[in-house]
Amino acid sequence: MEIKEYTRDCIPDVVQFERDLRAEEDFWGWEIDEAYIAGVTASFTNPAFDNSLSLLAYQDGKVVGRIDSTKICSRFDGSTKAYLDWICVIKSYRHAGVAQALMEALRRKLREQGIDTLIGLIAANEEAQRFYRSLPNAQLRDEGIWIDTNF
């Protein structure tokens, strides 16, 4: 397995990953259409995404896993933390160390940038919760909330 940083050149591989995800589990909440691809492509030239860090796990010549994070700077305590936005592995590649390798690589890259805390919302499904409980030096605490700003 090879872990690589997600760059613009990887977009076709990631689009195929998204399609492979849907072939094995059809419950994802967004469509892989031209608008989606255009938005992802634009994110690589939009400075608003400069604090984003995404890694891809390649195996058998294709993307089988992905992890996405964003740096969060806070004047609350003058710290920089990171938010874990998403981690996902194609179902047929789960329980083979892919998610662990992605998480380890992300933690290493964040440490290199002086970030010592990664914060994430916990998915409601039990499989994801088992994964988070298995992470070394991690603890489940607090609760997350999604607040819609369109009111």
Per-range role (PLM):
Residues A42-L56, Y83:
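A short helix-loop-beta-strand connector motif used in the catalytic cores of GNAT acetyltransferases and
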Residues Y132-E143:
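Conserved acetyl-CoA-binding loop of GNAT-fold acetyltransferases
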Residues M1-Q16, F27:
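A short beta-loop-alpha structural element at the N-terminal edge
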Residues R22-A42:
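Conserved GNAT-fold acetyl-CoA-binding loop/helix
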Residues V89, H95-R108, S134:
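Conserved acetyl-CoA-binding loop-helix of GNAT-fold acetyltransferases
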Residues I72-L84, R94, L140-D142:
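A conserved beta-turn-beta hairpin within the catalytic core of GNAT-like acetyltransferases
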